[in-house]
Amino acid sequence: MLRRLLERPCTLALLVGSQLAVMMYLSLGGFRSLSALFGREQEPAFDYSHPHDVYSNLSHMPGAPVAPGGLPAPQGLPYCPKRSPLLVGPISVSFSPVPSLAEIVERNPRVEPGGRYRPARCEPRSRTAIIVPHRAREHHLRLLLYHLHPFLQRQQLAYGIYVIHQAGNGTFNRAKLLNVGVREALRDEEWDCLFLHDVDLLPENDHNLYVCDPRGPRHVAVAMNKFGYSLPYPQYFGGVSALTPDQYLKMNGFPNEYWGWGGEDDDIATRVRLAGMKISRPPTSVGHYKMVKHRGDKGNEENPHRFDLLVRTQNSWTQDGMNSLTYQLLSRELGPLYTNITADIGTDPRGPRTSSGPHYPPGSSQAFRQEMLQRRPPARPGPLPTANHTAPHGSH
């Protein structure tokens, strides 16, 4: 019976036509609809040709509730919505003019000393620490602070921004500074999420939520203008990434031995795999970032040893990381926009040694920090519950 049906011309034509229709449906994007049915994230569409101002909707944010008589309202706030109603999507990112410190402070009146913020009318669903390695890039830092504070406030997170300064004139070590930042941030609070953030990358879409994925490390800078808004290669883990403290410790943090530019991102991606975890990413249309243009940094030249180190990662990752981290904490300062941590992390043992200590490179770095301290709001009565004023000095 079936054989006779298949031999009929009309039946064969119907089968061939059905196959062609299915193929056309999939080629025109139907696969995305099918994927959504099975729980895969659908690629959202955004119009980046009409971005919103980075400070959009902040005027809609209510202040803390007040009871009759002017006293603070009782505690017991509801949780913030899973998706903040304040989000606008694509935001305008401009590199000129570089905002002054006074302007950034004025535009962010709800930010507390140390760069802390939490929503006034709802309980945040995530507490996120933003950790930024830094040296001698004050213009970049101001641009980041100007754009990042309103970006995070619209997401209704509780957050704190930590800027980790490498003291001395030795070779820059981004990954080791991030290890220092994680350790110092976790002394302050039990953060839910750690965002490791390059100072020269500015997010362009506030739907790119600064929260962690409990299933594994998350790489969020998936579409930078530097790379034509696409991922440069599949295992890329550079720019901006997010891990829970448990995920960070499971992979032994980041490597300490990468002095200079290059290599540490690939080492970190390898650590994720060796620790039995998988990298997740937001959709390309969401993870947009603009990179601030800059010349090559003195003291951050290309690392000639990076390939030798990468070959050893499989054997070295359990010995080189948070469990081998040594540094000297030189200062911890609560400025109006961020917590500034200055650390002596030593020098590259393979290269020419330079003085390491509280000696800052030429430029405005020290003046910038002094200005931050001078503009710090007056102390409030009682201790700050989330800031560590008595961090010990010495080796860690």
UniProtKB/Swiss-Prot annotation:
Residues annotated to bind N-acetyl-D-glucosamine: 263-266, 306
Glycosylation sites: 57, 169, 340, 388
Residue ranges crossing the lipid bilayer per the database entry: 11-31
Binding site for Mn(2+): 200, 294
Keyword vocabulary terms for this entry: Disulfide bond, Glycoprotein, Glycosyltransferase, Golgi apparatus, Lipid metabolism, Manganese, Membrane, Metal-binding, Signal-anchor, Transferase, Transmembrane, Transmembrane helix
GO MF annotations, alphabetized: beta-N-acetylglucosaminylglycopeptide beta-1,4-galactosyltransferase activity; galactosyltransferase activity; metal ion binding; N-acetyllactosamine synthase activity
Protein name: Beta-1,4-galactosyltransferase 3
Organism: Bos taurus
